[in-house]
Every structure is written in structure tokens, then in C-alpha cells.
Amino acid sequence: MKPTLRRKLEALAERHEELERLLSDPKIASDTDRFRTYSRELAQLAPIATTLAEETRTKADLAAAETLRTDPEMRELAEQEIAIAQAHLTTLDEQLQRLLIPQDPRDECNLFLEVRAGTGGDEAAIFAGNLFRMYTRYAERQRWKVEVESDTPGEHGGYKEIIARIVGRGAYSRLKFESGTHRVQRVPATESQGRIHTSAATVAIIPEADEIADISINPADLKIDTFRSSGAGGQHVNKTESAIRITHLPTGVVVESQTERSQHANRDKAMKRLKAQLIESERSQQATAEAMTRKLQVGSGDRSQRIRTYNFPQGRITDHRVENLTLYDLPNIIEGDLDPLIDRLRQEHQAEELARLSNAP
């Protein structure tokens, strides 16, 4: 481990001890807000303190085993103990480095998934449908709930646009690397000459706004329109203007909801999406300079960045943000087996974060 990382760990361990002292102070215990704040911080630092304590014990075991190695009768046993201790220290070192990576407060959030057909006409819409199905299948494997907010079907299948809310623990943490342009190379069903076509679809992953991180929106900045829904709800939705379209005038952001029976319910859904969009837009602008130096623009919603190519003739999927990240398992991945891909992206992100921490003063 680099000395800079070790110093950060030692500082956090000292802070953990300080918090334990503070929480034992009757004055702090009587102050509900401070007690809650310190308790939350202590809980966040506890894994680091526990792992450091285990590292200290393991180093002591290693030193004792090295002392025994000088005894001919104990040498064989000592060598075994040394090997076990060294292996455990390596594991603990890796754990401590991972614990240093700041937790993304949005990781446990639900999210909005937006998939839109890009270049490629009908084939792009079909591919957008393939991507949405891929994420839906993955969500099913994770036991997450998928709620379609709005959709515009393609003329020959798939979707020109589909927006859904995904509800489940850790949903954003797993899918936050999916934002960007996805490209497909394959022979369309309508291609009589057997030529390979290239089409594209864009994906945006937007964390749902937490009530704690809620933002204030001036009602005067909103233009609210109603229209007849074509979504769920049976014949009722076509008889009343229950669907809602909200335009945020300062930014031009437009959101719709038409899946609920009542205008009130659709308005609530649309406002949730609007808040999520505005919060994410502000966060992305603040992170632009930093993101420019990284290969993984996590959750930026940057649709202009080509992140992945799906080559059907070769059964190959390539993620362009990570060197040598090519998997020849496209049939399973497109059916929702995304974990091998997501795990590699998460590892790359952790490596980037550790490099950044190592170089920080």
C-alpha cells in the first residue's frame, strides 16, 4: 500500500477513536442532533477500524511465527503460520484500500432508465428494445421492480423511446456505468443481401432524487400540459386527459407520465422524474472537469459518449472505456447476464479512485 493511503487510514482510525470519546461525553449524548451525526460517522468508520485492528493482530502473529522459525523443531509449523499470515495480510491490505474509496451516496437509490433509438432507423428502434429487454431481464435476476413510465413504440418493433423506473436495493450502484451510446453491428431481418448494418441507441441512468437531497422548484418555472393517455388503465385513459407533461422553463427539461389512471398520480410521477433530472444535471455539470480525466463517466447521462459495441455475427461485446474489455458471450449478456461486464467496470472504477486517492495530497 502506498504511504499516502496508509496515512489516510491512520487519520481515519484516529477519528474513529475521537468519535468514541465524544459519544461517551454526557454533553454530546444530550444533544440529539450531534449524537446522531457522530453515531452515523462512527458507523461509517467502523469497518476501517475493525480491519486495521485485525491487521495489527495478524502482524503480531507473523512476528511470533518468524521467531519460532529459528527453532528446528518448530520450523515447519512456523513456515505454515508465516504463509497463512502473509496471505491474510495481503487480503486485509486489499480490503483496506477498497474501504478508502468514498461511498457514492446515490448507490442505494432507485433509478430512471431512459433508452432511445439513435442512428439506424427501424433497426435502431429494434436495438433499443433489445437493450430495454436486457436491463429488464437483469432487473428480474436481481429481484428489482421495473415500472414503465412512458414509451413510444417503433414502427417495426422495439422503441423509439422508453423510460422506466427501476426499484430495488443497490440498483443505481450496479447500473450507473450504463449511460452512453450503445452500438450494434448485425444483419437486420429486413436486409436481403446479408449485409451487416451499424445502428445505435442511447442509454441514460438517472438516480431517483432522495428526499434528503430534494430541491426546491418554483411553480412559476413550470409549464404543465394535460393530454389523453395511451398507456395502462384500459379505456378510461382515453376518455380523460389524465396524462401530464411538465416543462421546466429555465432548463427546457420536459418529462411526461401517462401510466396512472389519475391526473394527480401522473403529476406526482412526472415531478419525481423532473427533480431527478435537475439534480443529476447539476451534479453532472459540477463533475464535468473531473470526469474528463476518467474513462468511466459514472452516471453522467452523457449520451454522446460511445461506450459499447455489440457485434452479433462474432458474438462479441466490447466496452470501449476499459482496455481489453471484450467478452465473447453476447447471447447470454443480451439476455440479462450483465454481471461479468458490470463487475469489470466496477473494478476499473475502484482502481481509478485508488489512483486518485494515492495522488491526492
From Swiss-Prot:
Keyword flag Protein biosynthesis: yes
GO molecular function: translation release factor activity, codon specific
InterPro entries membership: PCRF (IPR005139), Pep_chain_release_fac_I (IPR000352), Pep_chain_release_fac_I_sf (IPR045853), Prokaryotic/Mito_RF (IPR050057), RF-1 (IPR004373)
Keywords: Cytoplasm, Methylation, Protein biosynthesis
Domain of life: Bacteria
Subcellular localization(s) per the UniProt record: Cytoplasm
SMART domains assigned: PCRF (SM00937)
A GO CC annotation given for this chain: cytoplasm
Principal subcellular localization: cytoplasm
N5-methylglutamine, modified sites: 235
Entry-linked Pfam families: PCRF, RF-1
PTM characteristics: Methylated by PrmC. Methylation increases the termination efficiency of RF1.
Region Disordered: start-end pairs: 284-306
Bridged cysteine pairs (disulfide): none
Family classification: Belongs to the prokaryotic/mitochondrial release factor family.
Summary of the function given for this chain in its UniProt record: Peptide chain release factor 1 directs the termination of translation in response to the peptide chain termination codons UAG and UAA.
Protein name: Peptide chain release factor 1
Species the sequence originates in: Xylella fastidiosa (strain M12)
Gene: prfA
